[in-house]
Amino acid sequence: MENNILELRNVTKEYDGQVVLKGISFNVKEGEFITLLGPSGCGKTTILKIIGGSQKPNSGEILFEDKNLIPIPINKRQFNTIFQSYALFPHLNVFDNVAFGLTIKKTKKDIIEREVMRQIRQVGLEGYENKKIDELSGGQKQRVAIARALVMKPKVLLLDEPMAALDVKLRKTMQEELKRLQQDIGITFIMVSHDQEEALSMSDRIVVMNQGTIQQIGTPEEIYNEPENAWVANFIGSSNIITDGIFLEDNKIKFDGKVFECIDTNFGENESSIDIIIRPEDIIIKNPNNGFFNAKVIKTTFKGIHWEVVVETSKKRQWIIHTINEYDIDQQVSIKWKPANVHVMWKEVDN
């Protein structure tokens, strides 16, 4: 995945005078699975529409295989889109839905038969080719939509929240299948999602967006473990964010009257324009007087695979902790963490 198949350079978009994309720039590598992740209204779907050709940017460049993509009409772009609604034809059976694009192109019948059945087998629907769409489950409909897109042999597949309509269990299954399929066929996938867990589990890289801007680009591990600002840290899972700490010097921070080790460097000396993040799963609950701070349990919530425990220290700071152990309200404990689990970042600057 060395070559950039797609490049966006300072792309902007306005609707009725409202700026919805504010200078978006990122590259997509050939064969990469990249997710545009963010809350509703952040601009991620607008980017997908601009890449697909149904909308044009107000300014900026988009290069596909080093050529200007913007003037190329939709039907000439080597992309296919899978919509949240799947946009299947209810009056056609599975085979004819998958074959639709090839039929419109007047492809020879023997080629249609071969290519359609190959894709139907690829998505695990062999034996369903004569079924009507309304006879299929949600997951099967999604497989038809995927086969219909892939039969056209696009170089890039665009996915607009493709699993949003599925129930939780089926969504997990389809996430695994879609990732496996992408790895098997090796083409570039660009997916829009508001689901953090989905993006973390499926993507090679994630573009995190908010209010028309890119907050961070990175691998799932980078996004989760090294968020670039407090907004990303809060959006990607729960976080304990210390906003009043001080970066004393390389590998040393201070808050609530105590000095702690960290692995961060290059934030200067006695620097207060920083935030400190410690993830809930990285905090260890110990017996009183065995940790950095003594604390009292003030809330517990069972989350299925772990307990979410909220404790409060004598400094009145509250900490969210994820643990497999159950604790009682008002129980006295102490908390501790490892230096590698402390993450320092610059405070966000309001422009």
From Swiss-Prot:
UniProt cross-references to InterPro entries, sorted A to Z: AAA+_ATPase (IPR003593), ABC_SmlMolc_Importer (IPR050093), ABC_transporter-like_ATP-bd (IPR003439), ABC_transporter-like_CS (IPR017871), Mo/tungstate-bd_C_term_dom (IPR008995), P-loop_NTPase (IPR027417), PotA_ATP-bd (IPR017879), Transp-assoc_OB_typ2 (IPR013611)
Protein family (similarity comment): Belongs to the ABC transporter superfamily. Spermidine/putrescine importer (TC 3.A.1.11.1) family.
Keywords, ordered alphabetically: ATP-binding, Cell membrane, Membrane, Nucleotide-binding, Translocase, Transport
GO cellular component, one term: ATP-binding cassette (ABC) transporter complex
Membrane topology per record: Peripheral membrane protein
GO molecular function terms noted in the UniProt entry: ABC-type putrescine transporter activity; ATP binding; ATP hydrolysis activity
PANTHER family: SPERMIDINE/PUTRESCINE IMPORT ATP-BINDING PROTEIN POTA, SPERMIDINE_PUTRESCINE IMPORT ATP-BINDING PROTEIN POTA
Quaternary organization: The complex is composed of two ATP-binding proteins (PotA), two transmembrane proteins (PotB and PotC) and a solute-binding protein (PotD).
Subcellular location(s) per record: Cell membrane
This protein's name: Spermidine/putrescine import ATP-binding protein PotA
Top EC class of this enzyme: translocase
Binding positions for ATP per the UniProt entry: 38-45
Its biological purpose: Part of the ABC transporter complex PotABCD involved in spermidine/putrescine import. Responsible for energy coupling to the transport system.
Chief place where the protein resides: membrane
Listed EC numbers: 7.6.2.11
Pfam families: ABC_tran, TOBE_2
Residues annotated as domain ABC transporter: 6-236
The gene coding this protein: potA
Taxonomic lineage of the native organism: Bacteria, Bacillati, Mycoplasmatota, Mollicutes, Mycoplasmataceae
